């Protein structure tokens, strides 16, 4: 009789441990997936194509077009990802979506300056220097949005970045009270870059 009781207790203990492990696994996987789904669903309605952003110029008067940094090459030129962001921002500027472009990127080291590369590229593509503003402390998406609101006093903007990044950028912008629209800059296949 005692052996059966010990086996029953051991079985219940094993079932409890397995149940707990499954619960923890569900929480560890489910909570981040749920949060990600919520961020995507809450920001997606404010995404626009380049054509929509240009057509909505009068309805949405943006203070600025914001380009988020994405790395530079060893020679100081924009990476392929950053180049696409800059090209889309240039097109939006030329469509008069906003009167200025804010380049926000990493310049935390004297030998690495995303923002200078971004501004140089935009100027070479015909954007007037007086309409380019540089945020040299955009070390993260959060930092960029914080500085847009608190340093550059942006109330409304069009954020340009790749779609995968746009959700987070839009979420952070809204968290700081910025009325933002997002335009994805997925012009290339980046799988080999």
Give the ranges of each region predicted by the language model.
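N-terminal type II signal-anchor transmembrane helix
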Residues: 2-52
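A structural signal for short, hydrophobic/glycine-enriched beta-strand patches
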Residues: 35-193
């Amino acid at each position: 009789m005692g052996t059966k009781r010990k086996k029953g207790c051991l079985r219940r203990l094993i079932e409890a441990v397995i149940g707990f492990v499954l619960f923890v696994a569900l929480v560890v996987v489910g909570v981040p997936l749920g949060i990600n789904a919520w961020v995507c669903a809450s920001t997606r309605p404010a995404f626009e194509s380049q054509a929509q952003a240009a057509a909505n110029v009068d309805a949405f008067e943006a203070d600025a077009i914001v380009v988020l940094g994405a790395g530079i090459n060893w020679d100081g030129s924009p990476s392929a990802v950053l180049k696409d962001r800059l090209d889309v921002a240039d097109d939006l500027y030329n469509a008069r979506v906003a009167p200025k472009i804010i380049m926000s990127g990493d310049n935390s080291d004297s030998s690495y300056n995303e923002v200078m590369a971004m501004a140089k590229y935009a100027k070479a593509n015909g954007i007037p220097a007086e309409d380019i503003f540089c945020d040299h402390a955009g070390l993260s998406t959060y930092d960029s949005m914080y500085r847009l609101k608190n340093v550059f006093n942006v109330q409304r903007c069009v954020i340009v970045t790749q779609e995968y990044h746009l959700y987070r950028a839009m979420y952070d912008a809204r968290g700081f009270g910025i009325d933002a629209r997002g335009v994805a800059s997925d012009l290339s296949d980046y799988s080999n870059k």
